[in-house]
């Protein structure tokens, strides 16, 4: 990925729900991760829907909240594209937009962040988040 890494997390996929099968398969998925964002520890929870595309890839749209250990919140909305990889795992890449009143996390209000999100066959998740404005500022 390009840009400065500003966050990462590890956790578990939660509930999965089939929303439709025609004309495309559409599923809703929730997850929860122990995460850091701009060096601040917390919990990241989110829900996304994934729809199959004609080539077998996935289009995902989601939203969630990062809660710091001292009670501050950052909401996020994202969209991305996913691919099935080996052994039943899924790999997504996409973009996030954040909103917060937290002073220490206020930088998030003005950036578009790029993410990588992986879910293995057992439901374990891993995420990495990058500040794309860092790259643009140095281009």
Please annotate each region the language model reported.
Residues 1-139:
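Beta-strand-enriched cores of mature, soluble protein domains
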């Amino acid at each position: 990925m390009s840009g400065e890494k500003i966050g990462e997390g590890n956790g578990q996929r939660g509930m999965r729900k089939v929303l439709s099968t025609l004309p495309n398969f559409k599923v809703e998925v929730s997850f929860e991760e122990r995460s850091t964002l701009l060096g601040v520890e917390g919990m990241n929870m989110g829900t996304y829907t994934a729809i199959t595309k004609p080539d077998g890839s996935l289009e995902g749209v989601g939203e969630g909240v990062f809660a710091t250990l001292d009670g501050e919140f950052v909401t996020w909305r994202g969209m991305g594209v996913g691919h099935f990889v080996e052994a039943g795992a899924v790999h997504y890449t996409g973009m996030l937009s954040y909103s917060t009143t937290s002073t220490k996390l206020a930088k998030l209000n003005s950036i578009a962040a790029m993410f990588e999100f992986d879910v293995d066959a057992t439901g374990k998740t891993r995420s990495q988040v990058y500040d794309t404005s860092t790259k643009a500022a140095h281009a």
